[in-house]
């Protein structure tokens, strides 16, 4: 269910801005997106798992906050991460 260490390292290496970057907004958004996708699949099977649904809503809110921050600070980076992750239609 949760991200394995290997999956997390793969996401970090894909979205990091420099070699030691693990906490930039892009990396955090990418990790949250992967966790959200996994939890969404879980909830499709387990429709009555309301505790996990609450966690999902919390993660979506956190990702929204990070995206708003990035949009305010650097719009080009925001557009790049949204396009790369396919978040907007």
From Swiss-Prot:
Protein name, per record: Small ribosomal subunit protein uS15
Function recorded in the entry: One of the primary rRNA binding proteins, it binds directly to 16S rRNA where it helps nucleate assembly of the platform of the 30S subunit by binding and bridging several RNA helices of the 16S rRNA.
Similarity field: Belongs to the universal ribosomal protein uS15 family.
Keywords: Ribonucleoprotein, Ribosomal protein, RNA-binding, rRNA-binding
InterPro entries: Ribosomal_uS15 (IPR000589), Ribosomal_uS15_bac-type (IPR005290), uS15_NS1_RNA-bd_sf (IPR009068)
Quaternary assembly: Part of the 30S ribosomal subunit. Forms a bridge to the 50S subunit in the 70S ribosome, contacting the 23S rRNA.
A Gene Ontology cellular-component term: cytosolic small ribosomal subunit
Example of a GO MF term: rRNA binding
Gene Ontology biological-process annotations: translation
One Pfam short name: Ribosomal_S15
Superkingdom, taxonomy of origin: Bacteria
